[in-house]
A protein has these predicted regions:
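N-terminal helix-turn-helix/winged-helix DNA-binding helices
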Residues: 1-2, 41-79, 88, 114, ...
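N-terminal helix-turn-helix DNA-binding module of bacterial transcription factors
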Residues: 1-58
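Alpha-helical recognition/docking segments in bacterial nutrient-uptake
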Residues: 64, 68-175, 229-240, 247-250, ...
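Extracytoplasmic/periplasmic substrate-recognition and gating elements
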Residues: 305, 553, 591-658, 683-687, ...
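C-terminal capping/gating helix-and-loop segments adjacent to ligand/active sites or protein-protein/ligand interfaces
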Residues: 367, 671-726, 730
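Hinge/lid segment of periplasmic solute-binding proteins
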Residues: 393-447, 598-602
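Extracytoplasmic/periplasmic solute-binding protein
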Residues: 435-441, 446, 476-533, 575
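Glycine-centered hinge/linker elements that transmit conformational signals in sensory
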Residues: 482-487, 519, 523-561, 589
Length: 733
């Protein structure tokens, strides 16, 4: 096995230098770092993590003790737990137990301690009846070897607990049985010695006992479930089965469909959260991935920040209604939707089939390009065939009163939907002159995406320091952005691993203007200045345009024409940074992507990101406004919004950002949710009530950007010209 001494000899450096490089200390030249890393790779060096732990005296290791890794709820918990530890430099030791054999849990705890785990998250099978308990000492107090957090199953000897309200889950499922007027049901639970199972059972029975329903209770566990279920079905077939555990529900379904199938057997079960619709069961859902995420957070907060762990009950997700807001009295005539050609349009095409299945109403979706969309909206008239319109967020001010019906006049109850959305996606976009015209469908923001592996590489970090005497960090200004882009452009740095430092997206005039405005708003909050005047030829505007033109040197001459191109270019792995709207970012993770696992993301420099994306409204000329609004409410709310996001779209619903299956896959969405509140960039002061024609504005501005980019005009001349045109075209502001 290769040693530090072997590496030092091969690299021609001291052992101290090797140690500094391997421990990522920043006091070694880039040349020596490269020699050490090359030598370590050639020798197949593997760090001795055990020795490192002994030197430190502690590890950054947490143990997760699970009953099994077959059940979906435990898989979801672990994935949520791991996502948090990965982002906080902790490792996870996963251990499995046999709930019928306490010795397996004792062994798991002993192993965790032998590995010097600093914390343990455990679904314990121990209670007060056990003669020996690995978590408490002879006085009955919790041992202080490490932080221990009990998951889902409460214990009398510790309040270090996080879980769900299983008693409430039991009550809600019992209400379903009463609502369906069942007279004979099976209630299947795990061992009632576990607090969650006991709480569920008592919650269920406290409600069902008020009815005339006969309940046959079957108590089982993971090892006897098949036998117990088959024995019950041999004696009788109930009208429905109610279960405390999704794993049990799958067994009931498989056994019934294989051996006893006659009529459909309704199965109601407590279940992990499902992002996509699933029809096998009626599910009362619990967000186990969030449970895992918060469990890891609580442990790490206790260990690193001395924040005491308190007993926590998370809110149950409950019955999630995939057909909420749907008008089941809808006609069979198609609903017609006009939308921009984006990833969201394709996810809507797929999910609208659920709407059609429920109502019988076909949904026809027409997709058009950016410029075609404006023309189509501008030419709408009484003969228009469209019922629902997807309008770009920056066009709402101009189009809302011209072509949309106020939603609150169609159905005032729509105002209650606003509570489910991220607040900063509503005002000032959906509401015009006191009326609600649209609901947020795919609100997005421009974010900075970067190659995390390049920014964290010790060789490039040292090289950057040697060149600029500054640390290589995610840029917070566009001057820093260009400096880093230059560093990662092969033309200016031959050993750069990528050809270009950045992308530019400059297709149409509207797209080109976005690159300029992102830079302008890094320096000023809104389009108007402190005097409420719009000066497109100001010194700040000139700086923004020149900064953009400098980026030209660090980007491909074959610039991106649309945001899907930008996502694809970044995914190809030949660029260090890209600015991209989050509703297009899912394509970064396409099947051919070369950057999966190495995608970093941050707010755009200046921390005043531009908002983008689309909102849905009812056409002024629709003959079916109530049906159209019903569809919009269904499409924009939970759980459809989360399903759309999983398919590559984005959501305005707050609950989507608690779905860690989505957030783990598209982690930049969490940043986007928090960044909406930082979006300003308003075109006119609040006192101005004149509609602002965004399309015309970005057309003027984008032409100037393209003229300067192509060398036709100098920046100040182009800006003076666009200012003159702006004053002429927008003189009524």
């Amino acid at each position: 096995m290769a040693t530090i001494s072997d590496i030092a000899k091969l690299a021609g450096v001291s052992q101290g230098t090797v140690s500094n490089v391997l421990n990522k200390k920043c006091n070694v030249s880039s040349d020596k770092i490269k020699k050490v890393m090359d030598a370590a790779l050639e020798l197949g060096y593997i760090p001795n993590e055990r020795a490192k732990l002994l030197r430190k005296g502690h590890s950054n290791l947490l143990s997760v003790i699970l009953p099994n890794i077959q059940s979906k709820q435990y898989i979801e918990f672990y994935l949520g737990f791991k996502s948090y530890t990965d982002s906080h430099d902790y490792d996870v030791l996963i251990q499995l137990t046999n709930e019928n054999n306490p010795d397996t849990e004792i062994l798991a705890v002993q192993q965790a301690r032998s590995y010097m785990a600093r914390g343990i998250a455990v679904f314990t099978s121990f209670n007060n009846d056990n003669i020996y308990n690995p978590y408490i000492d002879e006085t009955g107090s919790l041992k202080s070897n490490e932080e221990i957090l009990f998951i889902d199953r409460k214990v009398s000897y510790s309040d270090h607990f996080i879980g769900f309200d299983y008693e409430e889950a039991g009550r809600k499922l019992a209400l379903k049985a009463i609502e369906c007027k069942y007279s004979n049901i099976c209630l299947l639970t795990g061992p009632l010695s576990f607090s969650n199972e006991n709480d569920f059972y008592h919650g269920f029975m406290s409600v069902i006992s008020q009815s005339y329903c006969c309940v046959q209770h079957v108590q089982t566990d993971a090892h006897r479930k098949l036998q117990n279920i088959m024995q019950f079905f041999d004696n009788q077939i109930p009208q429905a089965v109610f279960l405390s555990n999704y794993d049990f529900a799958e067994c009931v379904k498989d056994i019934y469909n294989t051996f006893y199938y006659s009529d459909n057997l309704p199965i109601y079960t407590v279940s992990p959260l499902f992002t996509m619709p699933e029809n096998d069961f009626i599910k009362y859902e619990l967000n186990h991935r969030k449970l895992g995420y918060l469990a890891a957070k609580y442990l790490i907060d206790a260990l690193d920040n001395s924040i005491p762990i308190k007993s926590t009950l998370l809110e149950n997700s409950g019955f999630r209604h995939w057909h909420a807001h749907i008008d089941t009295n809808a006609t069979l005539k198609p609903l017609r939707i006009l939308t921009l050609d984006t990833p969201s349009a394709y996810s809507m095409k797929h999910l609208s089939k659920l709407y059609t299945q429920k109502t019988g109403t076909p949904v026809e979706i027409t997709t058009v390009l950016y410029d075609e969309m404006y023309s189509a909206l501008s030419s709408l008239g009484p003969d228009s065939k469209y019922d629902i319109l997807r309008i770009d967020v920056t066009w709402l001010n101009w189009f809302s009163e011209q072509i949309l019906q106020p939603l609150d006049k169609i159905d005032p109850s729509v105002l209650s939907d606003l509570n489910s959305f991220i607040p900063s996606t509503i005002e000032p976009y959906s509401t015009i002159k006191g009326h609600l015209y649209t609901l947020p469908f795919t609100p997005s923001i421009a974010s900075l995406f970067y190659r995390k592996d390049l920014f964290e590489n010790s060789i490039y970090k040292q090289m950057y320091w040697e060149k600029y005497k500054k640390n290589l960090e995610v840029p917070t200004t566009f001057d820093e952005f260009n400096k880093i882009a230059r560093f990662f452009t092969k033309k200016f740095n031959p050993i750069s691993p990528v050809d270009y430092g950045a992308t530019l997206t400059l297709g149409s005039y509207g797209v080109s203007s976005s690159e300029f405005l992102i830079r302008l708003f890094s320096q000023q909050e809104n389009l108007y200045d402190k005097n409420n005047e719009i000066r497109l030829n100001s010194s700040v505007a000139n700086w923004a345009l020149n900064n953009l033109i400098e980026t030209k040197k660090y980007s491909s001459p074959d610039y991106c024409k649309w945001w899907t191109d930008t996502a694809s270019a970044f995914a190809e792995g030949n660029v260090a940074m890209a600015i991209l709207y989050t509703n297009f970012a899912s394509n970064i993770l396409n099947p051919y992507s070369k950057v999966i696992g190495n995608v970093g993301f941050a707010s755009t420099p200046g921390h005043n990101p531009i908002i983008g994306g689309g909102y849905l409204g009812v056409s002024k000329y629709s003959k079916r406004p109530k049906e159209s609004l019903s569809f919009i409410r269904w499409a924009c709310n939970e759980p459809i919004s989360s399903a759309r996001t999983a398919l590559g779209s984005v959501s305005a619903c707050k609950l989507t950002y608690d779905n860690y299956e989505i957030i783990n896959h598209y982690p930049w969405l969490n940043l986007a949710q928090k960044d909406f509140i930082n979006c300003h960039g308003h075109r006119t002061p609040p006192s101005c009530t004149t509609p602002f024609n965004e399309y015309k504005f970005v057309g003027l501005l984008g032409k100037s950007v393209k003229d300067v980019y192509n060398g036709i005009k100098q920046s100040q001349d182009a800006l003076n010209e666009v200012q003159e045109l702006f004053q002429k075209e927008f003189h009524t502001l």
